[in-house]
Amino acid sequence: MQFLNQFLSITQIEYLKVIARMILNAECSKGTLFYLLNGHKRLQKKIVQAVDVFLPNSDSEMKRVCDDFNLKDYYYVAVPNAVDINKFDYDNVTVDDSIEFYRDCVLCVSRIEGRKNQLNIIKAIKDLPYKFVFIGQAGANFKKYYEKCKKEAPSNVFFLGQVEHDKLPQFYKLAKVHILASWMETPGLSSLEAAVMKTNIVVTKKGDTEDYFKEYAYYCEPDDLDSIRRAVIAAFEAPFNEELSDRILKHYKWEDTAKATLEGYNRIIGKQ
């Protein structure tokens, strides 16, 4: 994945992923053949040209679309990713004794796959004295990657596999740090969930994370092990800044997402 990100564009990577799924999973249909014949970028352009209102997850995501397709005249409403504040309610979550062993861990909640970059996280944090907990199952076609992560991991790294979503608030509450050092995030739902549960977050600089978390997150470069390590240490040693959870509660509830989506539809109606 690191090699692909360095030498290929996102559209080229997506094209190769479709070919890989066709070969490895026998995923071949008329749609697949149409896609392969026309190409990723050309089909994207057709879709973009037909759009009345864009609903990106952030202003920076919209800027990338504009840059990629040279858009000059367009409507858009930024529709944020969000968190369920009823489920992820810090004051009403009680941590079960059965998971107290993981108290003050560095947590990563995500599928285990190349794009999420767990292998580089594990390489970066070797010899650090903290407990590291990975929650999530291997992504499709990433079983070998998962095994490589486990082989690389020292004894203070724990893989818990898939955990029921209702139990995640407990893990966020007991964790000291949550990390998503992915190759790209917009911004990563687990980072939002961890932040609203008053856990310091380490996030990738790739994507739209800074639109969401501003100066309250600890940023890292996914291809730089020292950058990941420094961010983890800084986040672990720092007290939690309540302004981060306040920001999530103010701007990134599902109600905010619904209102922004409605605004987008209203713009379409207003243009007709």
Where are each of the predicted segments found?
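Short alpha-helical donor nucleotide-sugar binding micro-motif in glycosyltransferases
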Residues: 162-163, 170-175
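Conserved acidic donor-binding segment of nucleotide-sugar-dependent glycosyltransferases
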Residues: 217-225, 233-238
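Short hydrophobic beta-strand element within catalytic cores of glycosyltransferases
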Residues: 198-203
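Conserved donor-binding/catalytic core segment of Leloir-type glycosyltransferases
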Residues: 55, 98-116, 122-129, 133-135
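Short, structured helix-loop element that forms part of the nucleotide-activated donor/catalytic region
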Residues: 68, 131-160, 166-167
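Membrane-proximal helix-turn-helix segments that form the acceptor-binding/catalytic region
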Residues: 11-54
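Aromatic "clamp/platform" in nucleotide-sugar-dependent glycosyltransferases that forms part
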Residues: 183
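Acidic anion/phosphate-binding donor-loop and adjacent secondary structure
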Residues: 66, 82-103, 270-272
